[in-house]
Structures are given as structure tokens and as C-alpha cells.
């Protein structure tokens, strides 16, 4: 099985790197400047799993051929249009598994690759790429979930699942990836919302009065929107999520907050804006989520 990974940052570099370490046939699609750096320094990951240093297999967009069974997309959502252009020569037999935030990317990918070839994917990880190009993994979260968005056979996903099971990260072949996509969206909206609104980790928020309550209320706003859109979360899962995101001393920051700290562009439209639009379609008021969105609009205006 030949696997192409677009994006060699905190998600693509981490999961693709551990797939390569375990023996999978992995190729990373990169830009020329990034290729020079990776050829010189290799792919480096700092992780509780154990640090990783690899010589990655690299390809430029003009060198691609339609030979890949799986294409993993892990760019920022706002870079998707360029990613689609970069993948033009790779279009063929392969299926696409995007690991992007929100849901807006699926419509674009369906149009370009065909809905039968676009799966659903969720990455649970707290990671970033630092100024030296090293991927830093911050917590125990290290899981890929993927599956078919329609009721079709998992003929290509089963072999990919087998490859993933050889690695050090966790993996699940989902029976309802559409629900899992919503779960991730609501999870990241709460974590990104809280950590950007207050500019710190979850643990720094919950140590103060009302910190835990506002994180829970933010998550429950998102959960209510999901329910109105036909996606209900199990009570036991909700309890687990709330316990995790309000754990005392948690060092977790959303990647959006790390982007803010770097004065970089963020995915607030895809994570907050689209979710608020779903709420408005259902005449649902979500004041905390709206405050998070406004916070990021002010940030965007200041640093654009």
C-alpha cells in the first residue's frame, strides 16, 4: 500500500512519521524550501512516545503520479484550495482521508475527487511544529479515527487500519465517522474557544472560580448545536470529555492558541464561524461561542 501525506506538520509529520517508522510506504508532499530543510535535518519528533528521527521520502507537486492508494491531507483548512491544486497529478485510484478541522472541507474535496473517494478522518493530538522545524507532541492524545461517510465497503480502509496498528499511536476504524467528525468539531471548538478567549492552557483556566463552568458551558453549547443538526452524543462520552478538558493542571492548549502566540493565521471561521452559522439556522443562541469568535475576529483585524 502506497500512502501520500500532504502536510508534514504537527499532524501529518507526526502520524506519517510513525507510520514510516513502522515500515509503511510513506511519501510526504512538500514545497521546495521545506524539502531542502528536511533533506538536511530529517524529520524530527519530540514525544512522550519516544523521540523520532527519520529520513523521510519526499516529493514535489510537479513530480507526483497517480500511484497512491491513500492520500492523507493534514493542512490547515484555509490552505485547502492550494492543497487541491498541489494534488492534481496524484488524482487516480486512491482515496482521500482528510484530517482537517470542522466540516467545510468535505464539500470541496467531494467536488474535486468524487464523494465516493473522500473518507472522513479525525486526529486527536496536541502537537505543533516549532521554529526549528521539529514536531513537538505535548500529551497522551495520539489517535487517528477514520471511516466511510457513506454505507460502502471498507476494502481500502482495512489494509490502512492494519498499517496503523503496527505503529505507536492509537487507531480506530469508525462505524459512524460523520458522528465522530461532529464530536471532534465540538471538542476542538471548546478547547480552542477557551484557550484563545483566555490566552492560556486549560489548566490555567480551571484553577480559577468559574473556569471549569465556562469550559463546560462552552462545550455544551456546541453539543446542543450538534443535537439540533441530528448528532447526539452519549452521556458517558460527554462525561469523559468534560473530565478531560477540565482536568486540574492540564497543559493543553489548542493549536489555534499556539497560532495566536505565533501571531499566525487561524482557523476560527471553520471552527467557530461555521458552527455559529449552524446554530443560527436552528434559531439557537450560543453566547460563549460567539464571544470566542469575536475574540478571534478582533485578533485577525489586529494582526492581518
Locations of regions flagged by a protein language model:
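Residues at the C-termini of beta-strands that transition into short coil/loop
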Residues: 30, 49, 62, 100, ...
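NAD(P)+-binding Rossmann beta1-loop-alpha1 motif at the extreme N-terminus of oxidoreductases
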Residues: 1-51
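Short, charged/polar "capping" segments at the starts of alpha-helices
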Residues: 34-37, 107, 154
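Short, well-ordered alpha-helices that flank and scaffold nucleotide-derived cofactor binding pockets
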Residues: 17, 21, 85-89, 111, ...
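Internal alpha-helical scaffold of NAD(P)-dependent oxidoreductase catalytic cores
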Residues: 22, 89-90, 112-117, 132-235
